[in-house]
Amino acid sequence: MKFIVSSSALLKQLQQISGVINANTVLPILEDFLFEIEKNKLTVVATDLETVMKVHLDIEAKDSGKVCIPAKILLDSLKNIPEQPLTFNVDKNFAVEITSDNGKYKVMGETPDNFPKEPAADDANSFTMTSSALVTAINKAIFAVSNDDLRPAMTGVFFELDKKGITFVATDAHRLVRYTRSDVSCPKKDNFIVPKKPLNLLKGSLPDNDDELKVSYNSNHLFVVHGGTELVCRLIDARFPDYKVVIPADNPYKMVVNKHDFQNALRRVSVFSNKSTNQVALSISGSVLQLAAQDVDFSFEGNERMTCQYDGEDLQIAFNAKFLIEMLNGADTADIVMELSTPTKAGLIKPSEQGEGEQLLMLVMPLMLNN
């Protein structure tokens, strides 16, 4: 089997799917790319048994066939080869010889028979959405996903489908993000949980533009197709917690503050906080917001004050500054709105204006105030 392919085009596509491959895998075949050649088309597949990514390239080829090629050595070599046509020759024992303008490189491939088969999209429901809508949703929600494997339902993003739109929810029990798109229409009410890893892979490979994606799902898998790139992942088989019950219906106190100034003040003051809690206390009175942090063990203390617009009774409430800083990144407006209640009730964070066709709400649990 022989084919000719552009070195830079091949490298670009391989880098797009190489994130699927785990460094420490149990099965050696999972360290390989599967190359499939048919009618001047090359399909390259990578999998970790949970997620499959596939890309398609145009090549010059007279025959068809398959071979598994070790991913790391192929990527390392392509990174150092300038743009030029490369000729791949594969013999009957799956030995691969790569010929460039000035060199010849050999690597031992493997039989494709041992490469895992990808899941089929049987009984799948489908809908379309723009690439930017999915990328934005992933960016808004993924930071709140839990890393606690003992609670598998929280280790992914919950997709709640409706004819009126999609709601994306993520929580780690300390904070929660709910992001709704009303510019996407789904065929029926449904829901599923997508793991963090494939979402990060989609975020890295999809363009932030209005390209159309085809999204399909069945009871076990999610399928996303964009142009010549395909991703299939196993869904999390667990029940997502009833997130609606934890969102306060009425937080009477409202504070509007400049996002950039608030983030920077949190960064400065949190340097002096206890490193295990990152606790920063907010004292709000009139148009003054006071931030305070301390680490009693080391006699560290930091205080700052800034202006805000506040409608409510004087309040002192503490939060994890690291969480607040991360959550504020999700708001795309110059100002953010915090809706608060008592020092023991969850606070809500929203952008001062919602984008067209989208609604973002973030919830953060308070910490017990240090005396």
Model feature map: region roles:
Residues 1-371:
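Structural preference for solvent-exposed beta-strand-turn elements
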